[in-house]
C-alpha cells in the first residue's frame, strides 16, 4: 500500500531582486527545501500572498489568492521555524560534526548577517559547490536591502540561493560587534 503524501501550508517570506513577497505555500514532508530543489518544477505556487516593492516594503502593491514565483529568481526564503526547512537529510547528509560560522553575505541587492551551519572546516569553494542544491541554510538571519534600508527582514532560518552571492565573509568570533 502506498502511503499518502503529507502536505501542509507554511508561511514564508520570499525576496527577489525587486520584490518582497509574503505568502503561504503547500509543501510535502520534504519541506521548503524539497519544494525548492524539486527538478520537475521551475516555479513555486503561493496562496494568500501579498507583494511589495523593496523600495517601499510597507506599501502592498498586490494581494493575490494565487501567485507563482520562478525558482531561479528567488534570492532567499525566510521561514518562521527551522522545522519548515524539511528533512535534515536533504539539508545535510552523513553523521559529521556541524559547526556554526557567523557570516556576512552580500548580493547585488541585499546584505545578510547570519550563522551558517557547516560540517567540518569552513572552505568557501566547498560551500559554493557542494551538491546540486542551490540553496544554503542560514540561521538567525538579518537581511537589509543595501539601497533601501526600510526593508529589514529578521528570521530564525533562511534558505539563500547561492547563485546570487557576490561576497561571503566568515566573521571571526569577537569581530562581530565591530562595525
Regions inferred by a protein language model and the residue ranges of each:
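Conserved RNA-binding domains used in RNP assembly and mRNA/RNA metabolism
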Residues: 1-179
Amino acid at each position: 500500500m502506498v502511503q499518502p503524501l503529507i502536505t501542509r501550508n507554511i508561511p514564508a517570506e520570499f525576496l527577489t531582486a525587486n520584490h518582497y513577497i509574503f505568502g503561504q505555500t503547500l509543501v510535502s514532508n520534504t519541506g521548503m527545501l524539497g519544494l525548492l530543489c524539486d527538478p520537475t518544477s521551475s516555479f513555486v505556487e503561493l496562496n494568500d500572498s501579498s507583494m511589495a516593492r523593496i523600495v517601499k516594503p510597507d506599501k502592498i502593491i498586490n494581494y493575490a489568492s494565487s501567485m507563482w514565483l520562478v525558482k531561479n529568481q528567488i534570492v532567499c526564503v525566510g521561514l518562521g521555524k527551522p522545522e519548515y526547512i524539511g528533512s535534515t537529510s536533504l539539508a545535510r547528509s552523513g553523521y559529521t560534526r556541524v559547526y556554526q560560522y557567523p557570516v556576512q553575505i552580500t548580493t547585488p541587492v541585499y546584505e545578510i548577517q547570519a550563522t551558517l551551519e557547516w560540517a567540518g572546516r569552513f572552505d568557501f569553494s566547498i560551500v559554493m559547490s557542494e551538491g546540486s542544491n542551490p540553496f544554503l541554510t542560514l540561521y538567525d538571519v538579518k537581511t537589509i536591502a543595501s539601497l533601501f534600508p526600510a526593508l529589514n527582514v529578521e528570521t530564525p532560518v533562511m534558505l539563500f540561493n547561492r547563485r546570487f552571492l557576490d561576497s561571503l565573509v566568515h566573521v571571526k568570533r569577537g569581530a562581530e560587534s565591530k562595525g
